[in-house]
Amino acid sequence: MIDVMDKHFQEELHLSLAQSAWVQFAHYLGYFLMALPAGWLATKLGYRGGIIAGLLMVAVGGLWFIPATQIAQFWAFLLGVCLIAAGLTFLEAVANPYTTVLGAPDFAATRINLAAACNGIGWIFGPIAGAMFFYSTDASGKSTGAETLWMPYAGVAVVVLLMVLVFAKAPMPDLKAEETLPAEAAGIPGNPASTHSMAGFLLWLNLVVLSVSLGMIACAIATIFSEALFLPVLSGTTALFLLVFSLVLLLQRKKMRLESIWSRPHFSGATLAQFFYVAAQSGIFAYFINYMTTQPPVPVGNATASTLASVGFACFLAGRVIGAGVVKKFSAHMVLGVYGAVNVLLCACVMLRLGWASTVCVFLAYFFMSIMFPTIFALGISGLGDGAKKAASFLVMAIMGGAIMPKLMGHIADSSNVSLSFIVPLCCFLCVAAYGFFWSKLGGSPKSMAVISESKI
């Protein structure tokens, strides 16, 4: 439902496409801020406690939309979005690694894809609820979405509170990742120095991404006073953080121990791939309605476009279900690479504005991006043993990509058109494809699903 709110806020609050992207920023900011605390609490509370904590926070966020509708200010809605995302962070950081250790290690990617497929049910019905409550009209044709926006979120809060009772009573085994291989076995074959060098380079790239993310947070504060401050604050803050982080990395590079999860290139590469995947996904989801109301040969209305988003998410769900079988038959990292390459071509077709063919490509992009998040997650924590919980927190933090790229897409769409803005997800999918194709070169091993015990970050 969050992604279909953008068009609603554009019209009700008179926002540009780039300004409405603060919805995605608030959503993924919640993930970014809570990822590490969620991972830390998960180690203290266990799987059950972490899941219950996440569900309670989601319920609080959903109920906040009731007073937010009365306040009727953009910041109030953004706060509710951020609270829900913070709760979801607990679920991502706890439930995903829990899924990977519930069965045979070789099928971890398959299990996590099947579990994630359940999300598709919510994705399908979410846009339908959005069409009913965000874009509803009265008998005279006047929009009533401003008064009814809180209803679906309150409904979600009630359901989530019922789930809290279920998890509080249901038996849940507290499993741990097996440690089947010595730490040295998870490295890249060949010169250990080259492995260390690759790990250091990928860690530096992660610091670049982190610097941009912190720059965006500074921008969120600065643009409260003036939208014109966006680019100066972003560039200045990013450069400052990158300089500081680079100096720290340079001084501490010799202290990167073999036991650190950051010494594993396949993990540090996964955080980058996850950043770019979520960036691409968030941008496509956020501007789907804008695309459907302006770009096809026969544009549709807001409510119809919101309903069509359900078709896109149905494609997403189908991709998850089919993809779970595909990654079971073929190497998960190669499937990820191929799917990423296909989405590069699909985004290129959208940019070329080929009429209905481009519109179909948007729906196909939903299908082929479907397996990326859980597959990157499973590949990233492969071989990390008990370090998987900490690694999961960083992989969830990488979701911050979804807060940054929609702003860039929005600026391109405002200055040109929505079709051209698909160059942003195109570049992101290139990065995902590269990670998939080169995963084994980064030290990933299908036979190694749990290696590092009590890793030090």
Q: Residues of each region from the PLM?
A:
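Helix-to-loop junctions at the C-terminal end of transmembrane segments
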Residues: 33-47, 319-332, 413
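Intracellular juxtamembrane helix-capping segments at the cytosolic ends
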Residues: 90-104, 288, 370-385
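Conserved MFS/SLC helix-loop-helix module at the cytosolic interface between two early adjacent transmembrane helices
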Residues: 33-75
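Central cavity-lining transmembrane alpha-helices of secondary-active solute carriers
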Residues: 22-40, 310-322, 401
